[in-house]
Each structure stands twice: as structure tokens, then as C-alpha cells.
């Protein structure tokens, strides 16, 4: 079975740095945190949430001294006592820089346990952590009550998730079992439903297939674009212009009636860069009056660097996998409906819930 876990308590969404690399700070007042950051946790706790993962943050309004994961004020007093959460409290990884480089005093794993955490995730050195916790317990630095509370909650979570009846997974044909036609059909549908138009001036999309139209394609980013390009060419001839140097590229664009630009960024890791380069932004700025359709195969936040005035159409495909490249090409030529809804705010011109519906062409 599975246990539903919310993260990262008390709220990691409005930070500018990554706790894998440093210690982020939240400077909001206690009142603001209570009204905004804590709201989703309160609602989930009302519905018997199984677990909560803590955040590695500096939050002076809640605790001037301790990192939030190591803070008794934040974990025990706020989460467990004030919010009445009695589920499993799990630390974020304890080998992250926010803990390794910024924790002070006693061993952080001991401090985390005493703060009210039940499960210590990924200590930097497990053997050392075990020995330090055992030593602290013998010296009464960790109480019997705190240790037993954590153990009982862990055993309860294991029982609830069915680990008492665990059976070895049969690995024969496991790849085939996990990759069935019904799964690919669902992925195809999810990709199709998610393609989002955030701009479509003069009903530029869907493209009309015509011998009078000439279409050029420019690919930006560090990842493959071939599926997108191949699918575009299934509908009409599309020339790939990237072999030209930038000056020649800008000149060549003028000979086409439509230009498609694709930002293809690798999504192999959530920490990969998703932004346009400065050079790519400059190219877009110079050619954006040439009937441009911009397709984002990356996080929609990449649009924050782009001035959208002058660009005719913008599609957000969210990731650069083959199925999303295929669906984006189909959307451009009207083979599918476009009805996705933007889940985040980019700026005032592209707010959350932006959704321009584009009907597919009638066959």
C-alpha cells in the first residue's frame, strides 16, 4: 500500500534558493504564514493525512535560532500540538546542504528526533547517526517517551500500508507488465489534454496547409527535437534552420511566412536548467514580428524571460518527451483540440488558469 504524505512543512513554495544547496529563508510574518503557507496543511490534516515531510528553512518569525526541520517550536509545538497532527512526521533528506552546512550544536539527527520528527530520512552517515542516537538515549538526551512515540508511529504506518502482509514482487516479465498498451494510451491522453495555449493572435493556430505557405523551424535548448520536427513534416514541409549562424538565421527567417520556435530542455532531472539563454532571447526579440509560434517543451516559467508582444502564438507542452512533442505538432496543425489550463502564474499578461481553447480542424 501507499501512504499520502504532504510536503514541505511549513511551506517551501515561496523561496528563491534550493535547500539541496543552501539554507533558504522565509521572511514572512507569523500571521502571513498561518494564513497562506499553513492553509493546505490544515485542510489535509482535517482529512486524516498519513504523513508530513518537513522543510529545511530559516524562518525567523517562527524560530529565530533553529532550522525548521530541527525546530521543536515548529515541529512539536506548531505541527503536532497546535495543528493536532498525529500522523508520521518525516524529515526531508538530512544529507542536504541546508542541514550539513548550517546546523549547529548537537548532532542534527538527534536534534531532529527531539524536535518531533519520527522518520529521519537519508542521514549523511547512517552508522554514525545510529551510534549518536543510541549514545544520546543512554545519556537521557532523548527521552523514552519521544523514542517510543516515534517507534509506535512508524510501526502503525507500516501496518496501515500493509507491510505486515508483504509479498516478494515477481520480477518475471515485470518490464512488460509495467508498460502495457493501456498505460501508453493513458499517457497519450494526458499529454493531449495538457497542451496549453497561452496566446493565439488572429487564430494563427491551427495552421492551414497550403502551397503558398512556407514554414521554418528553429530549435533551442539542450535536448532532442527530432520527434517534434518529424511530426511537423507529416503535415507540411517544414525547414530546419538551425545550421545557419545567428546573423544568417535572422536574415533567412524573412523568407518564410511562418516560423516555429521550440524550446527543448532536458527533463531528466527537476534541477536541470529550463531557461532560454541570453542569445536565444535576443534572437526571438529580433524575429518576433515574423509570424512566430513559440512552443515550450520545459517548465512554463521559461516564459518569464520573453516579451510576448509581437509573438503570434505560444503553446506550453511542459516537458520534452516524445509524446509531448508529437501532441504539440498535432496541435499546431489542428489534429487535436487544445484545451489545457496553465497551472502557474508567469506574469501579469500570463496569469494562472490561462487557457485559450483551440478546436481541431474538421476532417
Task: Please place each PLM-identified region on the residue numbering.
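Preference for extracellular/luminal or secreted protein segments
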Residues: 81, 103-363
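Second-shell residues forming the walls of enzyme active-site clefts
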Residues: 1-146, 153
Amino acid at each position: 500500500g501507499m501512504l499520502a504524505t504532504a510536503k514541505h512543512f511549513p511551506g517551501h513554495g515561496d523561496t528563491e534558493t534550493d535547500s539541496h544547496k543552501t539554507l533558504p529563508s522565509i521572511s514572512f510574518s507569523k500571521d502571513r504564514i498561518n494564513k497562506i503557507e499553513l492553509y493546505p496543511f490544515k485542510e489535509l490534516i482535517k482529512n486524516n493525512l498519513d504523513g508530513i515531510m518537513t522543510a529545511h528553512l530559516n524562518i525567523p518569525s517562527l524560530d529565530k535560532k533553529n532550522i525548521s526541520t530541527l525546530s521543536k517550536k515548529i515541529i512539536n509545538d506548531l505541527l503536532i500540538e497546535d495543528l493536532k497532527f498525529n500522523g508520521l512526521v518525516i524529515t526531508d533528506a538530512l544529507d542536504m546542504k541546508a542541514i550539513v552546512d548550517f546546523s549547529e550544536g548537537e548532532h542534527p539527527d538527534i536534534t531532529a528526533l527531539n524536535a518531533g520528527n519520527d522518520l529521519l530520512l537519508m542521514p549523511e552517515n547512517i552508522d554514525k547517526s545510529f551510534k549518536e542516537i543510541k549514545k544520546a538515549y543512554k545519556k537521557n538526551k532523548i527521552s523514552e517517551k519521544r523514542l517510543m512515540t516515534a517507534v509506535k508511529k512508524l510501526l502503525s504506518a507500516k501496518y496501515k500500508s500493509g507491510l505486515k502482509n508483504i509479498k516478494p514482487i515477481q520480477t518475471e516479465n515485470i518490464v512488460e507488465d509495467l508498460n502495457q498498451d493501456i498505460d501508453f494510451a493513458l499517457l497519450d491522453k494526458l499529454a493531449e489534454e495538457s497542451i496549453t495555449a497561452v496566446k493565439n493572435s488572429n487564430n494563427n493556430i491551427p495552421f492551414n496547409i497550403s502551397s503558398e505557405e512556407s514554414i521554418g523551424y528553429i530549435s533551442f535548448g539542450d535536448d532532442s527535437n527530432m520527434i517534434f520536427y518529424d511530426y511537423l513534416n507529416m503535415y507540411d514541409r517544414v525547414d530546419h534552420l538551425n545550421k545557419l549562424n545567428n546573423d544568417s538565421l535572422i536574415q533567412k527567417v524573412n523568407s518564410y511566412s511562418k516560423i516555429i520556435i521550440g524550446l527543448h530542455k532536458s527533463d531528466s532531472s527537476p534541477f536541470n536548467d529550463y531557461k532560454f539563454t541570453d542569445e536565444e532571447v535576443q534572437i526571438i526579440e529580433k524575429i518576433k514580428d515574423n509570424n512566430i509560434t513559440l512552443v515550450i517543451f520545459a517548465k512554463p516559467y521559461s516564459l518569464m524571460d520573453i516579451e510576448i508582444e509581437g509573438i503570434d502564438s505560444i503553446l506550453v507542452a511542459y516537458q520534452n518527451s516524445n509524446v509531448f512533442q508529437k501532441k504539440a505538432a498535432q496541435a499546431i496543425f489542428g489534429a487535436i483540440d487544445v484545451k489545457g489550463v496553465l497551472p502557474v502564474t508567469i506574469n501579469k499578461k500570463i496569469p494562472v488558469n490561462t487557457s485559450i481553447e483551440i478546436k481541431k480542424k474538421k476532417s
